[in-house]
Amino acid sequence: MSWLSSFFSWLGEFFGTAANWSGPGGIPMRLLEHLEFSALALALAVVIAVPVGLLIGHTGRGEVIVVVSANLARALPTLGLLVMFVLLLGTASIWPVIIPLVLLSVPPILVNTYEGIRGVDPELRDAAYGMGLRGGQVLTRALVPVALPLILLGCRLSAIQVVATTTVAAYTGLGGLGRYVIDGFATKDYASVVGGSVLIVLFALVVQILFALAQRVAVSPGVSQRQKIR
């Protein structure tokens, strides 16, 4: 049990050190940096993936993009991309980190958005057209509300991936919670490694809970009940 006692000892040392709660390297600032990187990457991914997924799902054209995107999600070496973009763009800005994170985030959102729209009951689509709605109106008023649970699920999966993977931002000299892990290993400060790792896990759990709450608020009870029946 020595490893367990060491774990809690390092954890207590990390969170009990006053210097870790203030200044540019303090926990609040590192959390804010991590949030900024993650939120920017996720927002860009949503702006790219949701419209494309809606368009492909509604028209049925360009489905090969979804297939390629799904396979890409499994094959992307995030750290390799990070190194490549650092070499191409340098470390003077946050974009060498943001671009790989966006590329990592797009596939789950794109695939789930597409699947959500294509999975809507054809009778609902026909009924919407029968009521006189046009293509864009059918999409926004009839299809999107039904597909919303899957779309939000894609966003949640991407958000958790981004929060966890933003740790690699520390490799470029940028901030975020990954600084504790990377710097801790470099200096054999295992209290920082353990504390930073716990913070990253907790951050990911909070993000997951927030998205679950958002889904409960945004999705109509009728759609939720229908999915439970399925």
Locations of the language-model features?
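C-terminal transmembrane helix and the adjacent membrane-cytosol boundary/short C-terminal tail
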Residues: 60, 115-118, 122, 195-230
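Short cytoplasmic-facing helical segments at TM-TM junctions of multi-pass membrane proteins
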Residues: 112, 116-151, 177, 181
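Membrane-embedded alpha-helices of multi-pass transport/permease systems
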Residues: 47-52, 96-125, 148, 155-167, ...
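Glycine-rich helix-loop "coupling/hinge" segments at transmembrane-helix boundaries
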Residues: 87-88, 165-194, 198-200, 219, ...
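Periplasmic/extracellular loop-to-transmembrane helix junction in inner-membrane transport proteins
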Residues: 1-42
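Transmembrane alpha-helices
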Residues: 39, 135-168, 195, 200, ...
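Loop-to-helix entry region at the N-terminal start of transmembrane alpha-helices
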Residues: 29-37, 86-108, 147-149, 192, ...
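Cytoplasmic-entry segments and transmembrane alpha-helices of multi-pass inner-membrane transporters
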Residues: 52-85, 101, 111-115
